[in-house]
Every structure is written in C-alpha cells, then in structure tokens.
Amino acid sequence: MKEMKVIIAGPRGRMGHEAVLLMERTEHFNLVAAVDYKHGGEKISDLPGMPALDATIYADLHTCLEEVEADVLLDLTTPEVGKQHVTLAVERGLRSVIGTTGFTEEELKQLTETAKEKAVGTIIAPNFAIGAVLMMKFSQMAAKYFQDVEVIELHHDQKLDAPSGTAVKTVELIRQNRESKQQGHPNEVEQLEGARGANVDGIHIHSVRLPGLIAHQEVMFGGDGQMLTVRHDSFNRASFMSGVKLSIETVMNLDHLVYGLENIID
C-alpha cells in the first residue's frame, strides 16, 4: 500500500499515544509531525513512553501546515480544538480524520458543505471501535421491532462532553427506524430535575462518568414480557485503533465528509 504521511494532533493523550504506536507498527503510515501546544519544537521521541520516532512537534496546527507536507490529519484533541483543526484542514484541502465529538448539527452541516465544495475527504467518527459501530447498527435494526428504548453511556471521569457522541449517533440511527414517541407514563413527574436523563424524541439518554471506566454503552429495548439489551465495552484505547487505521486508509479515497464509521465499513 502507498505510504501515507500523517500528522497527529494530541499525541500526549491516551488515544494519541496509542495512535503514535499505530504509526510505528504500520509500514505504510509515516508520522511526519505532531501538534501539541505544550511541547512545540520537541520530537515525538522526547515525550515519555513514546517510540523512537523523529517527527517534530508543533505548538499549533497552522504553523505545522505551513512547514510540513502531509496526506492526513488525525485529530485526537478536545471538542473545541478539534472543531478548529478540522475547519482549518478542510479549508486548506487536507484530508482529516477527527476523533473528537461534540459537533452540533449546524457545525456538521457547514463542514459537510465546505468539504464537498473543496472536494476534500473528511471522516468524523464518534467512536473508532468496530464493535461500537456494530452496536449502533444492531440498535438501529432492533428499533424497527422495539419502539421503547433508552440509552445508557458510561465513560471515564475526564470526558468533557455529555452525552457522548456515540450515544447521540446511536439515537440518530434509531430514529431512522422509529417514529417520535413519548415513553413512560403521560403524567410522569421528575422529583429531581434531570432524573430521567436527556430526552430526544422520547428516547432518554443517561450519562455516567466515573474513574475506572473507559468507554461503554448499552441500549435497552423494552417490549411486552421481554427486554433486549445491546452492549459494547472498550476496556482500553487499543480497541479504537482498528477503526483509526481503517479511517486513515479510507479517507485517502474520499472527496466529501463522512460522519460515523458505520458509513465506511461493509
């Protein structure tokens, strides 16, 4: 396979560290630079626990793109920084794979239009774990037969956004096979505000944030005399790397924005 030159934004995070290791062990990936505001001017190999790669770290993406030729930007930063990075990448015609979440419908619409206008491949993935993508697709299938459903997503206590992008995407897919419906008793009253979670067309989303968790979600469907639960668990960040690898390889052949890994897997 042809060599792909990659920039990683956010190499110090747990996901970023796994992505750097992915670069090292994948023959056709070449890490040409990284972006980290705290370590500008250093090398990847200077960071604790990193492999002996000589990619330069830049303090900001703009400077990096001025000095480095790359094929793909892999962004694993925070929601706000990720939004800035993907906007800059699309405007500069650089393909990007974005692993941060928290995009609004309006932001996705604007990015989709710009990516189409620039004919630049872009993938935004709420979750890179193949199992999580299958969990979402199975939930979409089940919604055709079970109209009553609630989503419980559980993540580590350092996650910034709630609900998770995976939960939002799951509900989006479920709604394609389910009419808007108010679940529970029509006169239901919350004794404590927020007790029933977020409500999207009658689908309740509950967010749990605790140390010890990584990324987990279960989708509970209820019917007369039966329950169906679809669950996925990521026990470490290595679970996301197969999806990261697939996304980088796939975005090279795209000329538009794709939201969600389920749209690029067979």
UniProtKB/Swiss-Prot annotation:
Gene Ontology MF terms in the entry: 4-hydroxy-tetrahydrodipicolinate reductase; NAD binding; NADP binding; oxidoreductase activity, acting on CH or CH2 groups, NAD or NADP as acceptor
Binding site residues for NAD(+): 10-15, 99-101, 125-128
EC number: 1.17.1.8
Binding locations of NADP(+): 38
Gene3D superfamilies given in the database record: Dihydrodipicolinate Reductase, domain 2, NAD(P)-binding Rossmann-like Domain
Top-rank taxon, per record: Bacteria
Active site, per annotation: 155, 159
Catalytically driven reaction(s): (S)-2,3,4,5-tetrahydrodipicolinate + NAD(+) + H2O = (2S,4S)-4-hydroxy-2,3,4,5-tetrahydrodipicolinate + NADH + H(+); (S)-2,3,4,5-tetrahydrodipicolinate + NADP(+) + H2O = (2S,4S)-4-hydroxy-2,3,4,5-tetrahydrodipicolinate + NADPH + H(+)
Binding site for (S)-2,3,4,5-tetrahydrodipicolinate: 156, 165-166
Annotated metabolic or biological route of this protein: Amino-acid biosynthesis; L-lysine biosynthesis via DAP pathway; (S)-tetrahydrodipicolinate from L-aspartate: step 4/4
CC annotations in GO: cytosol
Record's subcellular location: Cytoplasm
Family annotation (Pfam families): DapB_C, DapB_N
EC main group: oxidoreductase
Keyword Transmembrane assigned: no
GO BP term (any one): diaminopimelate biosynthetic process
Keyword Amino-acid biosynthesis: yes
InterPro entries membership: DapB_C, DapB_N, DapB_N_CS, DHDPR_bac, NAD(P)-bd_dom_sf
Keywords for the protein's UniProt record, in alphabetical order: Amino-acid biosynthesis, Cytoplasm, Diaminopimelate biosynthesis, Lysine biosynthesis, NAD, NADP, Oxidoreductase
Main location: cytoplasm
Physiological role: Catalyzes the conversion of 4-hydroxy-tetrahydrodipicolinate (HTPA) to tetrahydrodipicolinate.
UniProt family annotation: Belongs to the DapB family.
Protein name (Swiss-Prot/TrEMBL): 4-hydroxy-tetrahydrodipicolinate reductase
Species this chain originates from: Bacillus anthracis
Gene name tied to this protein: dapB
